[in-house]
């Protein structure tokens, strides 16, 4: 075709021909200017080609721009055959590897930051997973730190645990054997909360009692499930009156550990003792899958203190008047037996790990928007259906956005400010219409704002606090948006500068909780009264924290997780505005800072966040009636 008399020609064979010639030149060593030395094997190539394929090598070559000869790059931890596969891919775009080489190709692609190959290899490994390879594949993916694949493998394990439990790799895993004392004719509850209690017991044993995980696995541990739903060892039974005094002594002989456990309950009027507050280490604790083997026997695959292991639970009924047996309990255990048609499993994770995300409840669904992970700020928005335990995508935001909060106003979702990954502060905002599934812009803030608190009150949208353009100190600013006039105005400033606060409406007032003034985390709390446009300090929290989440339940505030300047937190506290008092309540199963926290129905959900080591896509739920957090959900079988 010759538009306007000029020649325009595209040779469709040129690229394919040139690529083949380039690869031939590489193999013959012609015009090569880089040598890869992989475990003693030398491979020649062209820097320009490798730099286009591998960001890792691009950085090396770019920093060595003055080199006039052949560059030398050494790798002592890669398989030469796998690197040769990647070289062929770089020159031909074709990826060919035998099945037993795919893991090594994946490792090499991860090292060289060739993400497309890494993803293809990972998906291939998942497609080949079976009962025999499930554990070894999980160990490999866990070592690689690929949480996308790890989620898929864990989902497979949940569906095939009994088959996997018969394989050699599973049988070689370390095992924690627990024998749980039960009243006669009472079975272990078919309830995922039991495993959460087991994790809490192991954590107490290690962190408070100085136990070693290996030592706990050396012998069968006898525990007691109390009538008030606590899982205790013998050293804790002295606090419970359900067992006879002589029986307590018998049990304590089997478990001589000292009991330093204190309930995490305190009010703002008193101090919280250091020994009472458990700081969660930066290690992984999670339940992967569980199955019922027999009437009173359960099998569970878990990660305890970053160790993949098996938990074997056996409930033992105590015979009446049998002095040689475990003591008979004097009160029937009030265990939660699930209906026959119910199924309890770990809640489905989000499709993306997210920290600094916005969450809200909309039409009975949990909405999780934006946030960031190790790679980027996100535009995607996910919707969780509590009844089906399924995450689905809705329309993405127009702007990648993290370090922001989200609110519901007039049945629309509003997001304002935050960071897009390139500029620390955004002034733009947008709203989501669930009927049209469309995001539309809203008038920009009067100034850029990141790490601010957002909530709705009396038909208006409030943006409170945030960080300055340099991200080094908090702001006192408070702006309010009227959706009818589409105008921003100022209201009274905060008493204390705050960024990364938790903000929530309760009782026709706004509470701004914690945050940081500069780098120092705050435990102070302020309350805004719109009638007189004033901020007033109220009782401080027990724990200073920034990046926490907050939700309302039963006329109280629940402040969840966060960061205390040293650790990501799992501890949670509740504020009673009538008594102006804070108290510690049940801790989460995972430490989470910058998580999304939202009330849906009569429960509170914590989604995503950062645990001090990894970005999270997991979800857990708090039941105010039992004061417990759990990663499990209960579904009805169809």
Curated annotation (Swiss-Prot):
GO biological process: proteasome-mediated ubiquitin-dependent protein catabolic process
One Pfam family here: BTB
GO cellular component terms attached to this protein's record: Cul3-RING ubiquitin ligase complex; cytoplasm; cytoskeleton; nucleus
Subcellular location: Cytoplasm; Cytoplasm, Cytoskeleton; Nucleus
UniProt KW keywords: Cytoplasm, Cytoskeleton, Kelch repeat, Nucleus, Repeat
Domain (BACK) ranges: 134-233
Keyword Glycoprotein found: no
Major subcellular site: cytoplasm
InterPro entries per the UniProt record, alphabetical: BACK (IPR011705), BTB-kelch_protein (IPR017096), BTB/POZ_dom (IPR000210), Kelch-typ_b-propeller (IPR015915), Kelch_1 (IPR006652), SKP1/BTB/POZ_sf (IPR011333)
PANTHER family in the record: BTB DOMAIN-CONTAINING PROTEIN, LD33804P
Record protein name field: Influenza virus NS1A-binding protein homolog
Organism the protein comes from: Xenopus laevis
Lineage, uppermost ranks: Eukaryota, Metazoa, Chordata, Craniata, Vertebrata
Gene name, Swiss-Prot/TrEMBL: ivns1abp
């Amino acid at each position: 075709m010759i538009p306007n008399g000029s020649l325009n020609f595209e040779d469709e064979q040129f690229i394919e021909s040139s690529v083949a010639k380039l690869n031939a030149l590489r193999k013959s060593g012609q015009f090569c200017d880089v040598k890869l030395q992989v475990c003693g094997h030398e491979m020649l190539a062209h820097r320009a080609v490798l730099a286009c394929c591998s960001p890792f090598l691009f950085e090396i070559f770019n920093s060595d721009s003055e080199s006039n000869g052949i560059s030398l790059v050494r790798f002592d931890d890669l398989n030469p055959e796998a690197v040769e596969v990647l070289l062929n891919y770089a020159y031909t775009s074709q990826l060919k590897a035998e099945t037993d080489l795919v893991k090594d190709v994946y490792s090499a692609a991860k090292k060289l930051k060739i993400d497309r190959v890494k993803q293809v290899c990972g998906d291939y490994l998942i497609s080949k997973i079976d009962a025999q390879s499930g554990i070894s594949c999980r160990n490999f993916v866990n070592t690689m730190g690929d949480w996308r694949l790890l989620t898929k493998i864990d989902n497979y394990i949940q569906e095939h645990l009994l088959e996997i439990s018969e394989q050699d790799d599973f049988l070689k895993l370390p095992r924690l054997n627990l024998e749980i004392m039960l009243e006669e004719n009472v079975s272990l509850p078919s309830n995922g909360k039991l495993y959460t209690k087991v994790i809490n017991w192991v954590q107490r044993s290690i962190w408070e009692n100085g136990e070693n995980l290996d030592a706990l696995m050396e012998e069968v541990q006898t525990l007691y499930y109390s009538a008030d739903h606590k899982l205790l060892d013998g050293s804790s039974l002295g606090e419970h009156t359900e067992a006879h005094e002589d029986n307590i002594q018998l049990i304590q002989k089997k478990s001589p550990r000292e009991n330093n456990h204190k309930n995490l309950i305190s009010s703002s009027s008193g101090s919280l003792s250091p020994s009472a507050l458990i700081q969660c280490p930066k290690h992984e604790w999670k339940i992967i899958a569980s199955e019922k083997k027999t009437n009173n026997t359960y099998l569970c695959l878990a990660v305890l203190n970053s160790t993949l292991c098996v938990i074997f639970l056996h409930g033992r009924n105590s015979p009446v008047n049998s002095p040689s047996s475990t003591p008979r309990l004097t009160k029937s255990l009030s265990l939660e037996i699930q209906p026959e048609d119910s199924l309890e499993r770990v809640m489905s994770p989000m499709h993306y790990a997210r920290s600094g995300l916005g969450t809200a409840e909309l039409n009975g669904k949990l909405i999780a928007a934006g946030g960031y992970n190790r790679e980027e700020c996100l535009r995607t928005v996910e919707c969780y259906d509590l009844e089906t335990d399924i995450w689905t995508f809705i329309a993405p935001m127009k702007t990648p956005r993290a370090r922001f909060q989200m609110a519901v106003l007039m049945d629309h979702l509003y997001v304002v400010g935050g960071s897009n990954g390139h500029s620390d502060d955004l002034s733009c905002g947008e709203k989501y219409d669930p009927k049209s599934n469309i995001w539309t812009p809203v008038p920009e803030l009067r100034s850029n704002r990141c790490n601010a608190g957002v909530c709705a009150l009396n038909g208006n949208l409030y943006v409170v606090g945030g960080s300055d353009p340099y991200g080094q100190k908090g702001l006192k600013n408070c702006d309010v948006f009227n959706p009818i006039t589409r105008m921003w105005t100022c209201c009274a400033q905060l008493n204390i500068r705050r960024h990364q606060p938790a903000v929530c409406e309760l009782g026709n007032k706004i509470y701004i909780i914690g945050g940081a003034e500069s780098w120092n985390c705050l435990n102070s709390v302020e309350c805004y009264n719109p009638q007189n446009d004033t901020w007033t300090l109220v009782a401080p929290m027990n724990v200073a924290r920034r990046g926490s989440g907050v939700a309302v339940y039963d006329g109280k505030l629940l402040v969840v997780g966060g960061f205390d300047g040293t650790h990501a937190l799992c501890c949670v506290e509740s504020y009673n505005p009538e008594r102006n008092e804070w108290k510690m309540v049940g801790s989460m199963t995972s430490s989470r800072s910058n998580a999304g926290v939202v009330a849906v129905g009569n429960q509170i959900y914590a989604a995503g966040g950062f645990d001090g080591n990894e970005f999270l896509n997991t979800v857990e739920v708090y039941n105010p009636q039992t004061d417990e957090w759990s990663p499990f959900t209960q579904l009805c079988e169809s």
